[in-house]
C-alpha cells in the first residue's frame, strides 16, 4: 500500500507536465545563434542573409521537419522559414533580419508522418509488397490537413476524389505522393509531436558595425601649424582628403575641455610648459566635462557644421567615450561620491602599478555612485547622439563593470539601434569576448601583435569559425596613438604596406591612425610608443612627403568598396603557399561570382618566391582546370592553368598581390 501511495504522490500535480514531456519527441539543440543559453543576443547585420543552424532529431526512424521563426521585438507576427537538412542531424535555414533593431528567434520541429508514410510505402512498392492498407493510411493522412488554404484544400480533395480502391496500387500511390501533393502537405499537414524551442534574442546592427574603414585623427593637430591649435573648421578642410583615401568613418580622440591640474607635458612629462595642451584623455576643467567642447576646437555650432559636412562627404564621425576625469573635472566638485578618496582626504589618481596617471581620476561605479553615475554616463552618450554622433569608440571598457555596459548599451540601442560601440579593449580573451556579448558591436583585437603566418592563421581562424564570430566583430587597427607596433618600427615603408594590406583585406572593419600614410614610426626607445606623440603636443603633418603610401590606401579601400566578397568577415579562407613568409587567403560571395585571392609577403626585408595553390575546387573544378585571373593592382588579365602556380613578391616593389578569379562561364 505504501508503494502505491508513493506512486500516486509522484503523479499529484505532475500529469500535465508529464504529458507535455511525453509529446516532446523531437530534440532541438546546438543552435548556432544561441549565446550562453540565450542570455545574450547574437549579432547579425540588418539586410544580410544569415545561416541559422541547429541539431534537430527524433527517436526511431520517422522523418521530421523544422522551421525557424523570427520577428522584430515588440511585434506580434512571426515570419516562418522552413529549414533544410544538411548532414548528421544538422538543419539550416537562411534568414534575413530586415530592420536595424532587436529581434527574436525560435524553432519549431515535428514528426512528419506524411513523409514517413511516403518513404515507407515507396520501399514496399519497390519490393513488390501489397500496399492496400498503406494506401488507406495515406488517404487518412491527406484527409487530416487542417490549416490548408483554398488552393491546397482543393488539391487534396481532387486527389482523394480521383482515388479508388479498384485502381492499380502504383498509380494510386503516385497520385498521393505527386510533387503537388508533397508541396501541399509540407505546407499544411498536421505537425505531430510539435516541439517549440525557447525564444532567443538577436540584434541586427546596421552594416557599418560589420564593414567599415576608420581614419583616426586628433582635431587639435589639423591646423597645419604646430603653433596653432586646430579647430573643427580645420577638420572640415581635411574631409576631402580623408574621403579621397576611401575611408567612411572619421574618428576623433576626445574633444572635451582638458584639465589643468597635473597636466602632462610633451612625451608624458610631469613638467609641462605653459603652452602644452595636455592629454585629451584628461577630460574636464572649469570649462566643462564630457558634454562640453574644448573651446579652442570650436563650439556646438561649428561641431554641427562638421558633422553635416562629414555626411556630405560620405563620412561618419566617431567620438571617443573615455570614462575618466581630470582632477578639475566638474563632477569631482559636484559629485564627490562618484570617486575614490584616500584616507588623507586626497582623491585617488588612476594607477596600473607601478604606473601612475596623475592627470586622470577614475570614477567608482558602485557605493554612492549607483545609480546616478550610471544615468549620467548614459545621458552623455545620448547627448552626443542628439548632436549627430552614432559611433563611439570606448576607452578601456574592460576596466569598467560588465553590468554597466550591458545596461547602458541596451538603454541607448533601445532608443537608437543605429548606434555602434567599439571596445578599445586590449585585454584577456575571455574579457574581450564578454564585452562583445554585453553589446559592443566592434572590438579592438590582437591583430596588432600577430605578425607571423602561423599567428595570423591561428587567430583569424578562431575569430571566423568559433562561436565568438556571432557576437564579437574585430576592428583591425594597424596602429593607434598609444601603440607604435614594433614590427612597424623596424620594417620601413614596405612593412607599412604589408600591415595595411593585411588589416584592410583580412578584416571587415579596420582602421589607421593618421601618420600611417607617411610611415611614421619614431619610437620612444624600447617602447611601443611614439616619440613626440601628439597625445601631449600639437603636430603638423605633411601627408604628401616623399615615401607616403596614399596610393596603397586608396587601392585597398577601393577593392573593399567595389567587391561584395570583402563584406563578410567570416567568409575568410586560408590557402596553401609553400613559404612560411607568405600568407595566402581568399574571400568570396557565397555564389563565387566575386572571388578574391590574396598573397602577402610578411617579410618586409627580402623578396620571397613561392609556389601557391589555386583553389580550383571552390568552383567545382578539377586540379588540371584553368581559370581566368585579373590582377587588381594593375588590371592585367591572363589564365592560370592547373592547381599550382609560382610567384615572387618583393617588399620594395610589390609586397602583396590581389587577384580576382573567374571560373568558366562566370561573367567578366
UniProtKB/Swiss-Prot annotation:
**Which Pfam families does its entry note?**
Alpha-amylase, GLGE_C, GlgE_dom_N_S
Q: Which residues bind alpha-maltose 1-phosphate?
A: 264, 324, 359, 396, 535-536
EC number(s) on file:
2.4.99.16
What keywords were assigned to this record? Carbohydrate metabolism, Glycosyltransferase, Transferase
A Gene Ontology BP annotation from the UniProt entry: alpha-glucan biosynthetic process
Reaction it catalyzes: alpha-maltose 1-phosphate + [(1->4)-alpha-D-glucosyl](n) = [(1->4)-alpha-D-glucosyl](n+2) + phosphate
SMART domains per the record? Answer: Aamy
Enzyme class, top EC level, equals transferase
UniProt region (Disordered), positions on chain:
263-288
- Active site residues according to the UniProt entry: 395, 424
Q: Which family is annotated? A: Belongs to the glycosyl hydrolase 13 family. GlgE subfamily.
Q: What does this protein do?
A: Maltosyltransferase that uses maltose 1-phosphate (M1P) as the sugar donor to elongate linear or branched alpha-(1->4)-glucans. Is involved in a branched alpha-glucan biosynthetic pathway from trehalose, together with TreS, Mak and GlgB.
> Quaternary structure?
Homodimer.
* PANTHER family registered for this protein in UniProt: ALPHA-1,4-GLUCAN:MALTOSE-1-PHOSPHATE MALTOSYLTRANSFERASE, GLYCOSYL HYDROLASE FAMILY 13 CATALYTIC DOMAIN-CONTAINING PROTEIN
Q: What is this protein called?
A: Alpha-1,4-glucan:maltose-1-phosphate maltosyltransferase
UniProt organism field: Cereibacter sphaeroides (strain ATCC 17023 / DSM 158 / JCM 6121 / CCUG 31486 / LMG 2827 / NBRC 12203 / NCIMB 8253 / ATH 2.4.1.)
